[in-house]
A protein has these predicted regions:
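Phosphate/pyrophosphate-binding loop motifs in nucleotide- or prenyl diphosphate-using proteins
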Residues: 1-179
Length: 179
């Protein structure tokens, strides 16, 4: 059964059996991570087939990231031993992909861009902003609750999403507007 009625008065169950308020920092973190995950799914849906064909590495990273976000959410609510924990290799994969984007598409940082361009690039910007919020929310939980690798992963992910928005616009032939 999907509904239990146990949350009708502003509390919810954590994985360890503890109840907490729905306004608890842990639930704020889980909510931001869930929202980010949904926007990453939307981003993938908005890629044209032509652009998607040129983003195979990035798409695979996003799919891995979606699984990782569930794991970080589980960390936030004290779920034991959840699968898909972020690793140093996941962080390295983001970094290597960003390095390749900068090299192959000359996407070095030379000033801020106004979020927009094609729809998929704009969605990458939305996901980037939500990622920053999720990162702040997980930091509020403290390093005891969230392992350093997860916090570092979220930090790199927002940088990746910024570069991805730029690459999508470049592949779409959409001119970006500098601030």
């Amino acid at each position: 059964m999907i509904y239990t009625r146990t949350g009708d008065h502003g509390t919810t169950d954590l994985a360890n059996g503890e109840r907490c308020k729905k306004t608890d920092d842990r639930m704020e973190a889980v909510g931001a991570l869930d929202e980010l995950n949904a926007h990453l799914g939307l981003l993938l849906c908005q890629l044209s087939p032509e652009i998607s064909d040129k983003l195979k590495t990035e798409t695979a990273l996003i799919l891995r990231t979606q699984r990782i976000l569930f794991a970080i959410g589980a960390q936030a609510v004290a779920a034991p031993n959840s699968a898909n924990q972020p690793t140093d290799e996941d962080i390295e994969a983001l970094e290597k992909t960003m390095d390749a984007m900068v090299k192959d598409h000359e996407l070095r940082f030379d000033g801020f861009r106004i979020p927009g361009g094609c729809t998929a690039a704009a969605e990458a910007h939305v996901a980037r902003c939500i990622c920053r919020r999720a990162e702040r929310a997980t930091w509020r939980l403290g390093e005891e609750a969230i392992p350093a690798c997860s916090l570092i992963f979220l930090n790199r992910l927002s940088d990746f999403l910024y570069l991805l928005s730029r690459k999508i616009n470049a592949l779409a032939g959409t001119e970006e507007k500098k601030v």
